[in-house]
């Protein structure tokens, strides 16, 4: 079953390659959506994919896909009404 979530990721997640390594993980797993830096220093991820694969992706995000990053907290919000994406993009 397809699922969509918003992940608000806090920690050392800007200026360390976090968005680009998140994209690599998403592409490898077949996850679609976006990742973007936020003004408060966090990173916002909108991710869509099959339930089990999406859980793998979320686990990778929580573990920080980049060795120079650090994830302190992830706020996960299920999304209901999301436009379909055909790829995973770094925004901004």
UniProtKB/Swiss-Prot annotation:
Signal sequence range: none
E.C. no: 3.6.1.7
Molecular functions per Gene Ontology: acylphosphatase activity
Annotated catalysed reactions: an acyl phosphate + H2O = a carboxylate + phosphate + H(+)
InterPro entries given in the database record: Acylphosphatase, Acylphosphatase-like_dom, Acylphosphatase-like_dom_sf, Acylphosphatase_CS
SUPFAM superfamilies: Acylphosphatase/BLUF domain-like (SSF54975)
Domain Acylphosphatase-like intervals: 4-92
Active site positions, chain numbering: 19, 37
Enzyme class: hydrolase
Keywords of the record: Hydrolase
Superkingdom field: Bacteria
Pfam families for the chain: Acylphosphatase
Similarity annotation: Belongs to the acylphosphatase family.
Protein name, entry field: Acylphosphatase
Lineage of source species: Bacteria, Bacillati, Bacillota, Bacilli, Lactobacillales
């Amino acid at each position: 079953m397809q699922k969509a979530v918003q992940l608000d990721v806090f920690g050392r997640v800007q200026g360390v390659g976090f968005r680009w390594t998140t994209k690599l993980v998403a592409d490898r797993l077949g996850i679609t959506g976006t990742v973007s830096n936020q003004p408060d220093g966090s990173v916002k991820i909108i991710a869509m994919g099959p339930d089990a694969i999406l859980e793998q992706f979320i686990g990778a995000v929580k573990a920080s896909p980049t060795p120079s990053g650090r994830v302190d907290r992830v706020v996960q919000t299920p999304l209901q009404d999301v436009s379909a994406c055909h790829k995973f993009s770094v925004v901004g």
